[in-house]
Amino acid sequence: MELLAVLAVPLSSAHYIRSHFPRKRGQLPLRQFPPQPMTITFIQYIIVCPLVFLAGFVDAIAGGGGLISLPAYMLAGLPVHKAIGTNKLSSAMGATLTTARFAKSGFIELRFAIPCSAAALLGSAIGARIALLIPEHVFKIIMLFVLPLVAAYVMSKKSLKDRSELEPFPFTKAIIIAVLCALFIGMYDGFYGPGTGTFLLLLLTGAARMPLNDSAGITKVINLSSNIAALAVYIFSGNVLYPLGLAAGVFSIAGNYLGTRVFTAKGSRGVKPIMITVLGIFFIKLRYELFFAK
Protein backbone atom coordinates (compact mmCIF):
# COMPACT_ATOMS: atom_id res chain seq x y z
CA MET A 1 0.00 0.00 0.00
CA GLU A 2 2.82 2.39 0.83
CA LEU A 3 4.43 1.67 -2.56
CA LEU A 4 1.13 2.42 -4.34
CA ALA A 5 0.81 5.70 -2.45
CA VAL A 6 4.29 6.76 -3.50
CA LEU A 7 3.62 5.89 -7.15
CA ALA A 8 0.27 7.67 -7.11
CA VAL A 9 1.84 11.12 -6.62
CA PRO A 10 3.86 11.31 -9.86
CA LEU A 11 1.14 9.45 -11.79
CA SER A 12 -1.60 11.83 -10.67
CA SER A 13 0.66 14.81 -11.38
CA ALA A 14 1.40 13.54 -14.88
CA HIS A 15 -2.33 13.02 -15.50
CA TYR A 16 -3.07 16.58 -14.32
CA ILE A 17 -0.44 18.04 -16.66
CA ARG A 18 -1.66 16.02 -19.64
CA SER A 19 -5.31 16.93 -19.02
CA HIS A 20 -4.69 20.65 -18.49
CA PHE A 21 -1.91 21.18 -21.03
CA PRO A 22 -2.77 18.98 -24.03
CA ARG A 23 -0.15 18.78 -26.75
CA LYS A 24 -0.56 17.58 -30.32
CA ARG A 25 1.74 15.00 -31.82
CA GLY A 26 5.01 16.54 -32.99
CA GLN A 27 4.32 19.83 -31.22
CA LEU A 28 7.06 21.16 -28.95
CA PRO A 29 6.00 22.21 -25.44
CA LEU A 30 5.44 25.95 -25.09
CA ARG A 31 7.30 28.04 -22.52
CA GLN A 32 5.11 28.53 -19.48
CA PHE A 33 7.30 31.17 -17.90
CA PRO A 34 7.51 34.83 -19.06
CA PRO A 35 10.93 36.39 -19.79
CA GLN A 36 12.75 37.57 -16.69
CA PRO A 37 12.69 41.37 -16.16
CA MET A 38 15.93 43.21 -16.93
CA THR A 39 17.31 45.88 -14.62
CA ILE A 40 18.24 49.13 -16.37
CA THR A 41 21.26 50.95 -14.98
CA PHE A 42 22.04 54.66 -14.98
CA ILE A 43 25.02 54.00 -17.26
CA GLN A 44 22.69 52.49 -19.87
CA TYR A 45 20.62 55.67 -19.89
CA ILE A 46 23.84 57.69 -20.27
CA ILE A 47 24.86 55.59 -23.30
CA VAL A 48 21.49 55.27 -25.04
CA CYS A 49 19.79 58.65 -24.65
CA PRO A 50 22.54 60.88 -26.14
CA LEU A 51 23.07 58.45 -29.04
CA VAL A 52 19.33 58.28 -29.76
CA PHE A 53 19.26 62.09 -29.65
CA LEU A 54 22.08 62.01 -32.21
CA ALA A 55 20.12 59.47 -34.29
CA GLY A 56 17.09 61.77 -34.37
CA PHE A 57 19.34 64.69 -35.31
CA VAL A 58 20.97 62.74 -38.17
CA ASP A 59 17.64 61.32 -39.35
CA ALA A 60 16.14 64.79 -39.70
CA ILE A 61 19.13 66.03 -41.73
CA ALA A 62 20.04 63.13 -44.01
CA GLY A 63 18.04 60.04 -43.00
CA GLY A 64 19.47 56.77 -41.68
CA GLY A 65 19.03 57.52 -37.98
CA GLY A 66 18.24 53.85 -37.33
CA LEU A 67 21.85 53.05 -38.20
CA ILE A 68 22.73 54.82 -34.94
CA SER A 69 19.74 54.17 -32.66
CA LEU A 70 19.73 50.35 -32.81
CA PRO A 71 23.50 50.02 -32.18
CA ALA A 72 23.05 52.48 -29.29
CA TYR A 73 20.94 49.97 -27.35
CA MET A 74 23.37 47.16 -28.06
CA LEU A 75 26.36 49.27 -27.04
CA ALA A 76 24.56 49.68 -23.71
CA GLY A 77 24.52 45.90 -23.29
CA LEU A 78 20.93 45.05 -24.20
CA PRO A 79 20.30 41.63 -25.79
CA VAL A 80 19.47 41.81 -29.50
CA HIS A 81 15.71 41.24 -29.25
CA LYS A 82 15.28 43.67 -26.36
CA ALA A 83 17.38 46.22 -28.24
CA ILE A 84 15.15 45.94 -31.32
CA GLY A 85 11.92 45.98 -29.28
CA THR A 86 12.92 48.98 -27.17
CA ASN A 87 14.19 50.78 -30.26
CA LYS A 88 10.76 50.27 -31.84
CA LEU A 89 9.16 52.07 -28.89
CA SER A 90 11.34 55.17 -29.19
CA SER A 91 11.09 55.06 -33.00
CA ALA A 92 7.29 54.87 -32.88
CA MET A 93 7.19 57.97 -30.68
CA GLY A 94 9.25 59.97 -33.15
CA ALA A 95 7.41 58.55 -36.17
CA THR A 96 4.03 59.55 -34.71
CA LEU A 97 4.96 63.21 -34.45
CA THR A 98 6.68 63.25 -37.85
CA THR A 99 3.66 61.65 -39.54
CA ALA A 100 1.31 64.12 -37.86
CA ARG A 101 3.43 66.99 -39.14
CA PHE A 102 3.34 65.65 -42.71
CA ALA A 103 -0.44 65.10 -42.48
CA LYS A 104 -0.93 68.67 -41.27
CA SER A 105 1.10 69.91 -44.26
CA GLY A 106 -1.12 67.96 -46.67
CA PHE A 107 1.57 65.55 -47.93
CA ILE A 108 -0.31 62.32 -47.14
CA GLU A 109 -2.68 61.07 -49.84
CA LEU A 110 -5.18 58.75 -48.16
CA ARG A 111 -5.93 56.58 -51.22
CA PHE A 112 -2.26 55.51 -51.11
CA ALA A 113 -1.74 55.75 -47.35
CA ILE A 114 -4.51 53.39 -46.20
CA PRO A 115 -3.66 50.27 -48.30
CA CYS A 116 0.08 50.85 -47.85
CA SER A 117 -0.39 51.14 -44.09
CA ALA A 118 -2.32 47.84 -43.99
CA ALA A 119 0.39 46.10 -46.02
CA ALA A 120 3.11 47.50 -43.75
CA LEU A 121 1.28 46.30 -40.62
CA LEU A 122 1.10 42.76 -42.00
CA GLY A 123 4.66 42.67 -43.30
CA SER A 124 6.17 44.12 -40.15
CA ALA A 125 4.33 41.69 -37.87
CA ILE A 126 5.64 38.77 -39.95
CA GLY A 127 9.18 40.17 -39.93
CA ALA A 128 9.15 40.68 -36.17
CA ARG A 129 7.93 37.13 -35.55
CA ILE A 130 10.72 35.76 -37.75
CA ALA A 131 13.28 37.87 -35.87
CA LEU A 132 12.17 36.42 -32.53
CA LEU A 133 12.83 32.89 -33.82
CA ILE A 134 16.50 33.63 -34.52
CA PRO A 135 19.01 33.03 -31.66
CA GLU A 136 20.92 36.07 -30.46
CA HIS A 137 24.39 34.97 -31.61
CA VAL A 138 23.03 34.22 -35.10
CA PHE A 139 21.35 37.62 -35.20
CA LYS A 140 24.65 39.31 -34.32
CA ILE A 141 26.37 37.54 -37.20
CA ILE A 142 23.60 38.73 -39.53
CA MET A 143 24.06 42.29 -38.25
CA LEU A 144 27.80 42.06 -38.82
CA PHE A 145 27.21 41.61 -42.55
CA VAL A 146 23.92 43.44 -43.19
CA LEU A 147 24.50 46.69 -41.30
CA PRO A 148 27.61 47.82 -43.23
CA LEU A 149 25.84 47.13 -46.55
CA VAL A 150 22.82 49.18 -45.50
CA ALA A 151 25.05 51.94 -44.14
CA ALA A 152 27.07 52.13 -47.36
CA TYR A 153 23.92 52.31 -49.45
CA VAL A 154 22.22 54.97 -47.31
CA MET A 155 25.30 57.19 -47.07
CA SER A 156 25.99 56.99 -50.81
CA LYS A 157 22.43 57.52 -52.00
CA LYS A 158 22.00 59.80 -54.98
CA SER A 159 19.63 62.71 -55.42
CA LEU A 160 15.96 61.85 -55.83
CA LYS A 161 15.25 64.69 -58.26
CA ASP A 162 15.82 62.61 -61.41
CA ARG A 163 13.54 59.86 -60.12
CA SER A 164 10.72 62.26 -59.30
CA GLU A 165 10.75 63.59 -62.88
CA LEU A 166 9.81 60.19 -64.37
CA GLU A 167 6.43 59.95 -66.09
CA PRO A 168 3.87 58.84 -63.46
CA PHE A 169 2.19 55.43 -63.70
CA PRO A 170 -1.62 55.08 -63.84
CA PHE A 171 -3.16 55.03 -60.35
CA THR A 172 -3.91 51.28 -60.31
CA LYS A 173 -0.37 50.29 -61.32
CA ALA A 174 1.21 52.80 -58.94
CA ILE A 175 -0.80 51.66 -55.94
CA ILE A 176 -0.11 47.95 -56.59
CA ILE A 177 3.63 48.65 -56.69
CA ALA A 178 3.41 50.89 -53.62
CA VAL A 179 1.52 48.25 -51.61
CA LEU A 180 4.07 45.56 -52.54
CA CYS A 181 6.89 47.91 -51.50
CA ALA A 182 5.11 48.57 -48.19
CA LEU A 183 4.65 44.84 -47.58
CA PHE A 184 8.26 43.78 -48.18
CA ILE A 185 9.96 46.83 -46.67
CA GLY A 186 7.57 46.54 -43.72
CA MET A 187 8.76 42.96 -43.30
CA TYR A 188 12.36 44.18 -43.31
CA ASP A 189 11.50 46.89 -40.78
CA GLY A 190 9.89 44.38 -38.42
CA PHE A 191 12.82 42.01 -38.77
CA TYR A 192 15.62 44.56 -38.50
CA GLY A 193 14.86 48.17 -39.45
CA PRO A 194 17.78 50.52 -40.19
CA GLY A 195 17.49 52.25 -43.56
CA THR A 196 13.74 51.62 -43.91
CA GLY A 197 12.82 55.24 -44.67
CA THR A 198 15.52 55.56 -47.33
CA PHE A 199 14.55 52.30 -49.06
CA LEU A 200 10.89 53.31 -49.10
CA LEU A 201 11.55 56.75 -50.52
CA LEU A 202 13.74 55.37 -53.29
CA LEU A 203 11.23 52.64 -54.20
CA LEU A 204 8.16 54.88 -54.16
CA THR A 205 9.79 57.53 -56.33
CA GLY A 206 11.60 55.06 -58.62
CA ALA A 207 9.52 51.88 -58.82
CA ALA A 208 6.04 53.37 -58.23
CA ARG A 209 6.95 56.72 -59.87
CA MET A 210 5.16 58.77 -57.24
CA PRO A 211 5.91 62.50 -56.82
CA LEU A 212 8.62 63.20 -54.25
CA ASN A 213 6.38 65.04 -51.77
CA ASP A 214 3.72 62.30 -51.90
CA SER A 215 6.42 59.62 -51.55
CA ALA A 216 7.82 61.34 -48.47
CA GLY A 217 4.38 61.48 -46.85
CA ILE A 218 3.51 57.86 -47.64
CA THR A 219 6.96 56.82 -46.39
CA LYS A 220 6.15 58.34 -42.99
CA VAL A 221 2.81 56.51 -42.83
CA ILE A 222 4.38 53.17 -43.76
CA ASN A 223 7.22 53.69 -41.29
CA LEU A 224 4.79 54.49 -38.46
CA SER A 225 2.60 51.48 -39.28
CA SER A 226 5.53 49.06 -39.42
CA ASN A 227 6.88 50.45 -36.13
CA ILE A 228 3.52 49.96 -34.40
CA ALA A 229 3.08 46.39 -35.68
CA ALA A 230 6.61 45.33 -34.72
CA LEU A 231 6.29 47.07 -31.35
CA ALA A 232 3.11 45.10 -30.59
CA VAL A 233 4.88 41.81 -31.37
CA TYR A 234 7.85 42.70 -29.16
CA ILE A 235 5.58 43.88 -26.34
CA PHE A 236 3.69 40.57 -26.29
CA SER A 237 6.99 38.67 -26.29
CA GLY A 238 8.28 40.69 -23.31
CA ASN A 239 11.13 42.36 -25.20
CA VAL A 240 10.43 46.06 -24.57
CA LEU A 241 12.08 48.00 -21.73
CA TYR A 242 9.54 50.79 -21.22
CA PRO A 243 11.47 53.24 -19.00
CA LEU A 244 14.50 53.24 -21.30
CA GLY A 245 12.43 53.30 -24.50
CA LEU A 246 10.22 56.19 -23.34
CA ALA A 247 13.20 58.25 -22.17
CA ALA A 248 15.03 57.58 -25.43
CA GLY A 249 11.89 58.51 -27.37
CA VAL A 250 11.88 61.97 -25.79
CA PHE A 251 15.55 62.41 -26.75
CA SER A 252 14.80 61.20 -30.28
CA ILE A 253 12.05 63.79 -30.71
CA ALA A 254 14.34 66.53 -29.39
CA GLY A 255 17.14 65.48 -31.75
CA ASN A 256 14.75 65.40 -34.70
CA TYR A 257 13.49 68.89 -33.88
CA LEU A 258 17.01 70.32 -33.60
CA GLY A 259 18.15 68.49 -36.75
CA THR A 260 15.31 70.01 -38.75
CA ARG A 261 16.36 73.51 -37.71
CA VAL A 262 20.05 72.86 -38.44
CA PHE A 263 19.25 71.35 -41.83
CA THR A 264 17.27 74.45 -42.76
CA ALA A 265 20.27 76.63 -41.92
CA LYS A 266 23.34 74.56 -42.89
CA GLY A 267 22.32 71.48 -44.86
CA SER A 268 23.66 67.94 -44.28
CA ARG A 269 27.39 68.63 -43.96
CA GLY A 270 29.16 66.71 -41.19
CA VAL A 271 26.61 63.89 -40.88
CA LYS A 272 28.65 61.07 -42.48
CA PRO A 273 31.64 61.36 -40.08
CA ILE A 274 29.23 61.11 -37.14
CA MET A 275 27.59 57.96 -38.52
CA ILE A 276 30.93 56.35 -39.40
CA THR A 277 32.27 56.99 -35.88
CA VAL A 278 29.25 55.49 -34.11
CA LEU A 279 29.11 52.47 -36.43
CA GLY A 280 32.86 51.91 -36.04
CA ILE A 281 32.55 51.72 -32.26
CA PHE A 282 29.58 49.37 -32.57
CA PHE A 283 31.39 47.00 -34.94
CA ILE A 284 34.42 46.80 -32.65
CA LYS A 285 32.13 45.80 -29.77
CA LEU A 286 30.16 43.34 -31.91
CA ARG A 287 33.26 41.61 -33.26
CA TYR A 288 34.70 41.36 -29.75
CA GLU A 289 31.50 39.73 -28.43
CA LEU A 290 31.32 37.27 -31.32
CA PHE A 291 34.95 36.21 -31.61
CA PHE A 292 36.81 37.05 -28.40
CA ALA A 293 34.44 37.24 -25.41
CA LYS A 294 33.92 34.01 -23.53
Where are the language model's segments positioned?
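Residue-level signature of the transmembrane alpha-helical core
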Residues: C49, F53, F57, K88, ...
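Selective hydrophobic functional segments
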Residues: G85-V138, I142-F145, N227-T277
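Hydrophobic alpha-helical transmembrane segments in multi-pass integral membrane proteins
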Residues: F184-F191, A230, F283-K294
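Extreme N-terminal basic, low-complexity initiation segments
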Residues: E2-V9
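Transmembrane helix exit motif
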Residues: L97-F107, L144-P170, R261, I281-K294
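Membrane-interface alpha-helices at helix entry/exit sites of multi-pass transporters
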Residues: V80-T86, R111, M210-K220
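Selected transmembrane alpha-helices and immediately adjacent juxtamembrane segments
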Residues: P37-P79, L166-A216
